[in-house]
UniProtKB/Swiss-Prot annotation:
Membrane topology term: Multi-pass membrane protein
Main location group: membrane
Highest taxon listed in the record's lineage: Bacteria
HAMAP family: UPF0391 (MF_01361)
Organism: Legionella pneumophila (strain Paris)
Subcellular location: Cell membrane
Membership in a protein family: Belongs to the UPF0391 family.
Protein name, as recorded: UPF0391 membrane protein lpp2589
Keywords, alphabetical: Cell membrane, Membrane, Transmembrane, Transmembrane helix
Organism classification: Bacteria, Pseudomonadati, Pseudomonadota, Gammaproteobacteria, Legionellales
Signal peptide (from-to): none
Residue stretches in coiled coil: none
Amino acid sequence: MLTWALIFFIIAIIAAAFGFGGIAVAAAGIAKILFFLFLVMFVIFLIMGLVGRRGPPPV
């Protein structure tokens, strides 16, 4: 799960660079939406990964 969280975080950073940096003016609105979408997905997968990391089940 933490791998997916890291992937979504990287995608969010890339979307932010395009949306907030003015590189792609025509796609700025879409990039901003994608940034927040992937940022939310990053947080969700991060929480799922941290909660799912429990010790081995009792025998």
